[in-house]
């Protein structure tokens, strides 16, 4: 039995943080779904930029689009959306078997809209209609403007993956927006089963940023905390999830068919080679969560993973570690704000490079 399938038996979904025409056409994604238990896909402009640069399967379509379509963003969509639809179709049986709890594929709104609430709502609605698949998640950044857009999209019954979250406070703001959006949807008499959302908490980037601050402090005490911020934060974010979605405000919505907003662990490939390659996988296995893995991390889990449920263990230790960061002067909320801003800029840079590649 493949080790990776043990993870799903423990209540966590494994998604692939990659999508390309190669994966679809050579059967690799279908094989991961069948053999590894992969049950969803995430994508972003950086992933599509790499796919376009490395796959031969886009050349004919790109040549045709350069002749027929003057708008570069529409060329991009004409290349990407067929892949998104094909991945959605591949995962549709799983989506249906899970009654809509799993089997999703993510597609991002244009990064230039990260600080534009109405623009994000309009773009998300357009992409939702354009892809026309029930198991699409439209990715919206977790900026304050993006969170406001997410609340509106939830009210409209559009599935959303809120991305670029780097702190417990940012995750909690997203949970609260989801509950408010569902409340408005319930008040209108709409079907609450038609709204699905996840909250993507980015991990390795947090440790990279916090480790740099700890190194700057330079004490033995600070250096002993390197590589611990992200996992501690994730464990406490999960406690916030439980408090929100086991609490009275959500219980009434759940009785009408509303689904809780699962946390999704993102940025789970280690960036520091000194750290264990499953640092952001094994300690965070737990029910009602998702981990989206790059190919290399999925291969590591398959090869030597030891999945046991650890997410609800050592919570007091995680809380003590976060208190220690504060005592040392490491402001995790300030780090999160910087990382979110940098993440938006990184995706915008990748998106513009992708458009230049297509143009």
UniProtKB/Swiss-Prot annotation:
Write down any Gene Ontology CC term. Answer: cytoplasm
Location in the cell reads: Cytoplasm
Listed pathway(s)? Carbohydrate degradation; pentose phosphate pathway; D-glyceraldehyde 3-phosphate and beta-D-fructose 6-phosphate from D-ribose 5-phosphate and D-xylulose 5-phosphate (non-oxidative stage): step 2/3
Keywords of the record, alphabetical order, are: Cytoplasm, Pentose shunt, Schiff base, Transferase
* Gene Ontology molecular function: any one: transaldolase activity
A Pfam family annotated for this UniProt entry: TAL_FSA
| EC code(s) of this entry | 2.2.1.2
Q: Where is the active site?
A: 139
Q: Which GO terms describe its biological process?
A: carbohydrate metabolic process; pentose-phosphate shunt
- InterPro entries this protein is in? Aldolase_TIM, TAL/FSA, Transaldolase_2, Transaldolase_AS
Q: For this protein, what reaction is catalysed?
A: D-sedoheptulose 7-phosphate + D-glyceraldehyde 3-phosphate = D-erythrose 4-phosphate + beta-D-fructose 6-phosphate
Describe the family membership recorded for this protein in Swiss-Prot or TrEMBL: Belongs to the transaldolase family. Type 2 subfamily.
Q: What does this protein do?
A: Transaldolase is important for the balance of metabolites in the pentose-phosphate pathway.
Name it.
Transaldolase
| Biological source species | Thiobacillus denitrificans (strain ATCC 25259 / T1)
């Amino acid at each position: 039995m493949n080790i990776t399938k043990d993870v799903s038996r423990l209540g966590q979904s494994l998604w692939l943080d990659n999508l390309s025409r190669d994966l679809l056409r050579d059967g690799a994604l279908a094989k991961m779904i069948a053999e590894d238990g992969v049950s969803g896909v995430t994508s972003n402009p950086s992933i599509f930029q790499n796919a376009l640069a490395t796959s031969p399967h886009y050349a004919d379509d790109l040549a045709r689009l350069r002749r027929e379509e003057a708008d570069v963003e529409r060329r991009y969509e004409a290349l990407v959306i067929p892949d998104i639809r094909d991945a959605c179709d591949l995962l549709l049986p799983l989506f249906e078997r899970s009654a809509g709890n799993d089997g999703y594929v993510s597609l991002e709104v244009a990064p230039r809209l990260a600080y534009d609430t109405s623009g994000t709502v309009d773009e998300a609605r357009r992409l939702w209609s354009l892809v026309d698949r029930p198991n699409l998640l439209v990715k919206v950044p977790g900026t304050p403007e993006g969170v406001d857009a997410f609340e509106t999209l939830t009210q409209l019954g559009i599935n959303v993956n809120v991305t670029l979250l780097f702190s417990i406070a940012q995750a909690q703001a997203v949970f609260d927006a989801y509950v408010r959006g569902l409340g408005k949807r319930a008040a209108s008499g709409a079907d609450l089963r038609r709204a699905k959302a996840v909250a993507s908490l980015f991990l390795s980037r947090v440790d990279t940023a916090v480790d740099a601050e700890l190194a700057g402090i330079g004490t033995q005490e600070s250096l002993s905390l390197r590589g611990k911020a992200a996992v501690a934060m994730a464990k406490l974010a999960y406690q916030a999830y439980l408090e929100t979605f086991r609490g009275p405000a959500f219980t009434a919505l759940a009785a009408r068919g509303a689904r809780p907003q699962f946390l999704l662990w993102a940025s789970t490939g280690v960036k520091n080679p000194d750290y264990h390659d499953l640092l952001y996988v094994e300690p965070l296995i737990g029910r009602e969560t998702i981990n989206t893995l790059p190919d290399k991390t999925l291969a590591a889990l398959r090869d030597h993973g030891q999945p046991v449920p650890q997410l609800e263990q050592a919570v007091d230790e995680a809380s003590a570690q976060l208190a220690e960061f504060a005592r040392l002067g490491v402001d995790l909320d300030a780090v999160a704000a910087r990382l979110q801003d940098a993440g938006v800029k990184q995706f915008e840079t990748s998106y513009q490079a992708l458009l230049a590649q297509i143009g």
